[in-house]
Amino acid sequence: MTEKHTTPDGLVIVDKPSGFTSHDVVAKMRGIARTRRVGHAGTLDPMATGVLVLGVERATKLLGHLALTEKEYLGTIRLGQTTLTDDAEGEITGSRDASKVTWEAIDAGVAELSGDIMQVPSKVSAIKIKGVRSYKRAREGEEFEIPARPVTVSSFAVYDVRDAVADDGTPVLDLVVSVTCSSGTYIRALARDLGAGLGVGGHLTALRRTRVGPYKLDGARTLDQLQQELTVMPVADAAGAAFPRWGVDARRARLLANGVRLEMPEEYTGVGAVAVFDPEGRLLALVEEHKGKAKSLAVFG
């Protein structure tokens, strides 16, 4: 008799390896979990490693509502060289001796790129310009501009400055940095803009995401580890950790299950998605307050 496989549903926090696109990780997880119902929240460039949040089965309903607005990174910025992609994946487009750049100048440049700033995303990115991905336009040699957009860099710190020599013999500086920023911030663009401000050019040579919203690297698993043992955060636990919790009695749970829009307590007004639980602790739905009543965003019960 064939054993029936049951796929656990929940969030999976993956430590993405370098060289994988976010979609590659989703495809790998579909094989590990033996289900097509896998999605991801947020994207990491192929070169980058670190935290990538996946949803399996019913948890895919949570992904679009998770508040993953703040992210943390560790990275290395090379001053003295520019590349087509603003990172080490692209061909070098310019080299300039960076050995005379001082700590004081670097600190001043970092300060200029901290706080609420306007940032022009990297041209080789997934941003659409008139319906076409900017990376496609860039690879076809098209000249175009991407509008600057507001981002918040709440922390940008340099931990070490190392003298180095690039492959073409150019004296360069490698900066070990940490960044805490809002969603939509390009660390590659920070590297590019820091180098430009210092007059020597710059690009990102390494990047590791250590946190996305409440999900940290110490809770992440590699794909090899997940292949050995699929570790998921159950849907109810994930929702309870990510959203305000609203416990309802059995009567209101039945009404909600039947599609009735319940009156919501005032404390949930304007807070966004709220996780609704029945008296037994079962996750029933994600709702948001709309004109005093619960509007369903996703139903689980």
Swiss-Prot record:
EC number(s) reported in the record: 5.4.99.25
Protein name: tRNA pseudouridine synthase B
InterPro entries xrefs: PsdUridine_synth_cat_dom_sf, PsdUridine_synth_N, PUA-like_sf, PUA_sf, tRNA_psdUridine_synth_fam2_C, tRNA_psdUridine_synth_TruB, TruB_C
Keyword Isomerase: yes
Positions annotated as active site in the UniProt record: D45 (nucleophile)
Function, as annotated: Responsible for synthesis of pseudouridine from uracil-55 in the psi GC loop of transfer RNAs.
Taxonomic placement: Bacteria, Bacillati, Actinomycetota, Actinomycetes, Kitasatosporales
Superkingdom of the organism of origin: Bacteria
Reaction equations catalysed: uridine(55) in tRNA = pseudouridine(55) in tRNA
Similarity comment text for this entry: Belongs to the pseudouridine synthase TruB family. Type 1 subfamily.
GO biological process, alphabetically ordered: mRNA pseudouridine synthesis; tRNA modification; tRNA pseudouridine synthesis
Keyword Nucleotide-binding: no
MF terms (GO), sorted A to Z: pseudouridine synthase activity; RNA binding; tRNA pseudouridine(55) synthase activity
Enzyme class: isomerase
Gene3D superfamilies: Pseudouridine synthase, PUA domain
Record keywords: Isomerase, tRNA processing
Pfam families in the cross-refs: TruB_C (PF09142), TruB_C_2 (PF16198), TruB_N (PF01509)
NCBIfam families given in the database record: TruB
